[in-house]
Amino acid sequence: MEHSPEEGASPEPSGQPPATDSTRDGGSGVPPAGPGAASEALAVLTSFGRRLLVLVPVYLAGAAGLSVGFVLFGLALYLGWRRVRDGKERSLRAARQLLDDEERITAETLYMSHRELPAWVSFPDVEKAEWLNKIVAQVWPFLGQYMEKLLAETVAPAVRGANPHLQTFTFTRVELGEKPLRIIGVKVHPSQRKDQILLDLNVSYVGDVQIDVEVKKYFCKAGVKGMQLHGVLRVILEPLTGDLPIVGAVSMFFIKRPTLDINWTGMTNLLDIPGLSSLSDTMIMDSIAAFLVLPNRLLVPLVPDLQDVAQLRSPLPRGIIRIHLLAARGLSSKDKYVKGLIEGKSDPYALVRVGTQTFCSRVIDEELNPHWGETYEVIVHEVPGQEIEVEVFDKDPDKDDFLGRMKLDVGKVLQAGVLDNWYPLQGGQGQVHLRLEWLSLLPDAEKLDQVLQWNRGITSRPEPPSAAILVVYLDRAQDLPLKKGNKEPNPMVQLSVQDVTRESKATYSTNSPVWEEAFRFFLQDPRSQELDVQVKDDSRALTLGALTLPLARLLTASELTLDQWFQLSSSGPNSRLYMKLVMRILYLDYSEIRFPTVPGAQDWDRESLETGSSVDAPPRPYHTTPNSHFGTENVLRIHVLEAQDLIAKDRFLGGLVKGKSDPYVKLKVAGKSFRTHVVREDLNPRWNEVFEVIVTSIPGQELEIEVFDKDLDKDDFLGRYKVSLTTVLNSGFLDEWLTLEDVPSGRLHLRLERLTPRPTAAELEEVLQVNSLIQTQKSSELAAALLSVFLERAEDLPLRKGTKPPSPYATITVGETSHKTKTVSQSSAPVWEESASFLIRKPHAESLELQVRGEGTGTLGSVSLPLSELLQEDQLCLDHWFALSGQGQVLMRAQLGILVSQHSGVEAHSHSYSHSHSSSSLNDEPEALGGPTHPASPVLEVRHRLTHGDSPSEAPVGPLGQVKLTVWYHSDEQKLISIIHSCRALRQNGRDLPDPYVSVLLLPDKNRSTKRKTPQKKRTLNPEFNERFEWDLPLDGTLRRKLDVSVKSNSSFMSRERELLGKVQLDLAEIDLSQGAAQWYDLMDDRDKGGS
C-alpha cells in the first residue's frame, strides 16, 4: 500500500529541540519557506495548471468557430474513458484483495454487489493446489528475468526491423510484479486412453505487471500497468512411454476463451475510450485464441524425435454434433409501445456456441413461440469440457434484449447418441427445443452410401448436411520457384473445397517453408468434391504452385488417409508439397434408435411416435399419388408488339380539333389480367412487352384482348379480339396481325408461344442466356422453368395445448407468389391433395417455402427446399416425406420443368433431349388466324445466336483475363443491345482481390448519355454480371461507332480512383450484329485495346 510522506516519516527523537525553533529568523519573526511550503505551493500550481489545461480545448473550439457540440462530445468522451478506467481499477483492487486474504474478503463482501466482484470469482468443486502456487511464487522472479531478456533481445529488434518508423522502439521497463499467477484448483479427468492424462487448471492472474515501451523519435510512450486473466487451462500429458521422462509431450490450451482485463498507460490510455476498449480487448483475445484456445493448442515435446507431432498438435476431433435448432416457446415479451402502456411481443433469434464456433439463426418477427428449423454442425475436440450454449435475444434497432440461455455438456450428447428435448432458459423465461445428434467418425467408406441416402432426405438450413469431414495437415514444401530477381518468396497456402477456403500463415524469405498447420472441411459428397491447393507468395499475386486432388482418391486409401509428398503443377520441376489428408465418414449410429419409416422424415422420440397409434392403421405411403392432370400445365408467352391505324379519341377545343389517342392493351387469360404501359399520343404505338401465364389444356379457354385510350375520366374503347387457346396450344406458335373488332379501324401485332416444361437441366444455361437476349426493358424477367408442387398430406403435427389436435392448413410460397390450401378441421394428420404451379426465373437461386399453420395456433412447422436440389435430381423431381421444423412431416412432390423456346434458338443446338417427351411437335408452320402469316421478326432470329464456342476451355485465357459479351442490333426497335455476361481470370494487383465492375462507352461519344455501368462485385476474379444495356440508334449510326468495354476496380475504400484491370474495344462495323452470339474477348491494357 502506498503511504503519504507524513505517514512514512520517522518520529523525532525525544530530548532534542524541534528543528523549527533553531532555524527561525530572529529579526523578522516569520519562519522561512521550508520544503513543506514549497511542495504545497507546487501542488497548488499543478492543480491550477490542470484546470487551465482543461479550458484550453474550450478556448480553441471557440477560436476556431466550432459549435458547442464539439465541446460536449469531447466531454462525453472523457467521462466515458474515466468510467471505464475507474471500473478497471476497482475490479483490479477487488481481485487483489480477494487473493491477498480470501477468507476475510469473502466474509466482508458477502452482501457486496456483484458489480464490485470480479466475474471469475467462484468456488469450483476441484482440489486445492497451494503447494503448486508456492512453487510458482518461487519461480516468478526468475520468469520475470527471462521475460525481460526475451522482450529486449528478441522482440524489440524484430519490431524495429518490421517498420522503418519504429527504429527507436525500445522496452524501457519490464516487470512481472510481485503478484504471481495463481492456480485456484486442479481437476483430473478419467481418460478413455491409457497413455493420456487430462488435467484442468483453474488459473487466475491478477498481476501488478508493468511493461513500458517508447518510440523516442516520436516522443511516444505507452504501456501496461496491471492485468487480469482468468480461465480454465487444460493440460494433456501424452503419450505416456516406458522411457524417461515417461511423458512424451505436454499440450496446453484454454477450452473456452479466458476473460481478460488490461490497465493501459501512456498513449494506450486511449484504448480505454468506450468502443475502443471492447475492440482492443477483442483483438487481443483473438490473438491469444489463435494459438491457445481450442482448436489451437500449445505443444511442448519432452523427448526428441517424437512421432506424430502433427497429430498431437492438431488431433482428430472426437466427433461431430449436429444441432437442430427447432423452436422456442413461452419467451418473454420485450417490445413495448406507447411508453410501455401496451405490451408487444419479441423478435427472437438465437446464438449457438460450441467453443469458438458460433452460429446465428434468422430473426422471427413478432413471435413469442418462434420456429427456426435450422441445422448446424460443430466439431467437438474435447470430451468432457466443451459445452453447447444457446442464447436467445430479442432483435432491436439499438441494443438486443437478452431472453435467456441454456448450457449442456457435450458429454451428455455422446452418452445418449440423440437428445430431443425442450430445455429451460436460464436468466429469462421459456424453453428452447433442440435435437442433438452425435456423429461418430468412421475410418472406412463402407457406410458412405447409407449416409448419403439418409442426408438426401434431410431438409437442412442454412447448409446441407455433411457426409464426411476432411482434415488436412499441411506440413511443408520444397524447392518452390523464386521470385523475380532470384529473391526468396514468402509462401502461404490457400486450400479450397467447393466454396470454403482456408489460408495458412506466411513463412518469410524461404523456398522450403514449414507450416505445420491443420485445416478442417465439411464434405457433402466426397465422391464428387475436390481439394484445390494454391501455393502463393504472401501478396497473393504470384502463384508458386498448384494442386487439385479428387477426394474420391481417399475413399480407396487405407483408413481414408494419404500421408505423402504431392508434386505441384505450374511450379518448378522439383517443387512438391507434403501433406497428410485424413477423411472420416460422419455416421449416426441408429442401432438403438428407431429409423424413420421413410427417408427424409427425422427420427422423433419413441413416445411421441407411438402416441395414438393403432394396430389396424394403414401403412404410410412412400410417395404421393397426384391426379392425371398434375404436371400437364404449359406456359403461354404473350408478346404484345405494336398496333396500327388505331382510331383517334382525343378532341380539343370542344371537339373542333381532332387529336390522337394514348393507347394501352389489356389482356385476360386463365383468370389472370395483364396491362401494357400507355404510349402517349400515338395511333401506331409500339409496346414490345412480354407477359407469361400458366395455362392448362381445358377446352373453351380464350385470350381476351382489349385496346383502350387512356383518359382522365373514363378510358375510351379502341377495339377487341379473342384468340382460342386451344388453337395456340395445338400449333405451339402464333405470330399475327389481328384486326380489331367493334371499331372502324385498327389492328394489333401479337406473338403467342407455348412453352412445354422439359424434365432436364441440360438446356437451362442456354435458356437463361436466350431470355436475357429477348428480354425487353418494360417487361419483367422471363421465366426459365415451371415448378409444379403436389401437397398430399401431413402427419404427427403438434397438438394444441398438448391434447387437442390443430386445424391445419398449408401455405406454399415461391418468391412473391403463394398458394394456400384448404383448412382441415381438428386433425394432426390432415389430407389436402392440392397442387400449385409457379413460374421460376432463377432456378439456381430461388427456393420453395412451405409453412403448416393452425387456425388460431400459429406456425406448426415449415420446410425450405432450394430449387437447386431439384436440378441435381433425375427428372428434376423429389417425391417423399419432408421433415417439418419442430415436429411432424409432410408428403410432397416437387418437380421442375425447363421452359425451352423452339423459336428463340435453344432448340437449334439442343441434342440431349428427345422430342418424344413433348405432347405435340412445335415445328409445324403456324396456321393463320385471320390473316396471312407475318414473317418472323428479328427477335426470332435468336435461334442461331448461341454457339458452342462458348466453352471456357476452347481457347487460352489472356494474361489480363477475359470478358464475355453479346452485342447485336434489334432492327424492330432500332436499338443496339449489349449484354455483359461475366469475366474470368482477371488479374490481381496486390494482396486483396479486386471489386470489379464493367464500364461501357459508345465512342466517339464520352458523355453520360451513352455511358453504362454494371453493379460492382465484391472480391472476385470471376464476376457474374448478366446486365443488359440498350442504346436508341439507327443502324447506319451504329455502324459508325465503337464499343469501349473497360473492366475496373475500386482502388481503395477512401479513394475515388478506379484501377483499370483491362479493356477491349469493338468496332461495330466489323461485327455481325444480326447474330448476337455470346463471345469471350481477351482484355488488353490501355495501350492495346483491340478485340479478340
Swiss-Prot record:
Keywords: Acetylation, Calcium, Cell membrane, Endoplasmic reticulum, Lipid transport, Lipid-binding, Membrane, Metal-binding, Phosphoprotein, Repeat, Transmembrane, Transmembrane helix, Transport. GO terms for biological process: endoplasmic reticulum-plasma membrane tethering; intermembrane lipid transfer. Ca(2+) 1 binds at residues 334-335, 394, 396, 401. Ca(2+) 2 binds at residues 335, 347, 394, 396. Residues 125-303 form the SMP-LTD domain. Changing residue 314 to A: Abolished phosphorylation by CDK5. Residues 911-921 have a biased composition (Low complexity). The modification N-acetylmethionine is found at residue 1. The modification Phosphotyrosine is found at residue 997. Ca(2+) 3 binds at residues 396, 398, 400. Binds calcium (via the C2 domains) and translocates to sites of contact between the endoplasmic reticulum and the cell membrane in response to increased cytosolic calcium levels. Helps tether the endoplasmic reticulum to the cell membrane and promotes the formation of appositions between the endoplasmic reticulum and the cell membrane. Acts as an inhibitor of ADGRD1 G-protein-coupled receptor activity in absence of cytosolic calcium. Binds glycerophospholipids in a barrel-like domain and may play a role in cellular lipid transport. This is Extended synaptotagmin-1. It comes from Mus musculus (Mouse). The gene is Esyt1.
